[in-house]
Amino acid sequence: MTYNSVSHICLVVPRHPEVSGGSTFVRNLAAAFRNHGLSVRVLSVYPGHPLGGDSFSPAADETDTIFVREELHRRPVSEGRPPWRAAPLALFKRWDRWRQLSALRRTMATLPANSVVIFTHVLGKMMVDESGFQRSPTGPLFVGQHHSSFASLEDEPWLREALPKHFADCDAFVALSDEDAAFFGSLLDVPCVAIPNPAPEGRTLTTQLAKRAVALARFSHEKQIPLMVRLFAAAITVPEANGWSLAIYGDGVERPQVAEEIEHSGMHTRIQLAGVVDDSATALSDASLNLLTSSLEGFGMTILEAACSGIPSIAFDCSEGVRSQLEDGAGYLVPASDETAYVEALRAAMTNDEERARRADRALTRSRSYDASTIAARWLALFDTLFPMDPPAPSEESSTAQARPESTHPCASPGVPSPRREA
């Protein structure tokens, strides 16, 4: 199949590059689109954090930031300042915001007509709307996304209002699993489809010989890293688990709680805060297990990254995205919130090398279904259902007509047109 309808992709993201599952998704998908011959541009709402090594080259040079002065725009200027200092800063903030959003509006207006703008989070679409950009009937497609599960909206209730409001004029919405696509479809009046994350390429298989577990995560409440420390400390109390250690890679607001839990566990010689690593392949290079303890997870990017290196993961059954990667023995899937079962699964993985190796093989085999080229092709196939394959030349009569045909995607309701952009 060939894809002639799209030549340019613009990814609008909250922050990029950085060490996170969402940023990894952007890197992998951008590389896959380029391999299909498309040009890719990344717009980051806030500044990213430069990554070392080859983990983002060459796309780092193609990332533009909307708000360079993040601290100025993320909080009220009156916070912690006397009025005589806040007043002039407020004027500067208004001017700077107008200037940056004007630049964003010009950027959107100059995108080629056969472009697709992918908003990986509603925040990016909110900025485009605030800029005053008006969509043209012949302008690019808009595709929304929420790079987490539908259940995550419970933790951020403002999203329930923001998503339907700002994604109302999108041509489609992409979720990470069929289950989430159905849930988001009940909230959004746009066609909702499921496309999982693409796998990283060029990973080296591990030997499965080291008694070493790893975790790669943002230290936020839904990742439950303090709980991970407690569960690992409980699992290694049996003699059969002698020699096993855990390296936790990442950082975040709960770092003090994680450090305190490690100290409280009495296992600080076997549980280590390993800092931030730019490339997950480095952290996984000598690991035999990958751990997740998330209560909310849209897909679980580290599960896929570990599987590509032949490493099985242990995780709670917190979403279809996680379940689809680990079920049928492709890892260790633990009933949601069942801490006892998690400890038992962890002990079983550490003490049965043959079974762990079998699950590692299944994880590796399943990871191939998320091949980056295959996932990119699914995105391109979606675009082809939204773009007319041979759009007619614009005429005076057709310039006021609808720019897109009725949606032919199976997620669209019969007889219900897909959302249209304002002329």
Where are the model-predicted features located?
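Donor nucleotide-sugar binding/catalytic pocket of nucleotide-sugar-dependent glycosyltransferases
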Residues: 147, 151, 164-203
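Short hydrophobic beta-strand element within catalytic cores of glycosyltransferases
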Residues: 312-316
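Aromatic "clamp/platform" in nucleotide-sugar-dependent glycosyltransferases that forms part
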Residues: 276, 295
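Conserved acidic donor-binding segment of nucleotide-sugar-dependent glycosyltransferases
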Residues: 328-340, 348-354
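An aromatic- and histidine-rich active-site surface loop
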Residues: 96-105, 116-137
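N-terminal strand-loop element at the rim of the active site
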Residues: 12-19, 32, 36-94
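A conserved mid-protein helix/loop that constitutes part of the nucleotide-sugar donor-binding site
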Residues: 23-28, 211, 218-236, 253-259, ...
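Nucleotide-activated donor-binding/catalytic signature segment of Leloir-type glycosyltransferases, i.e.
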Residues: 259-275
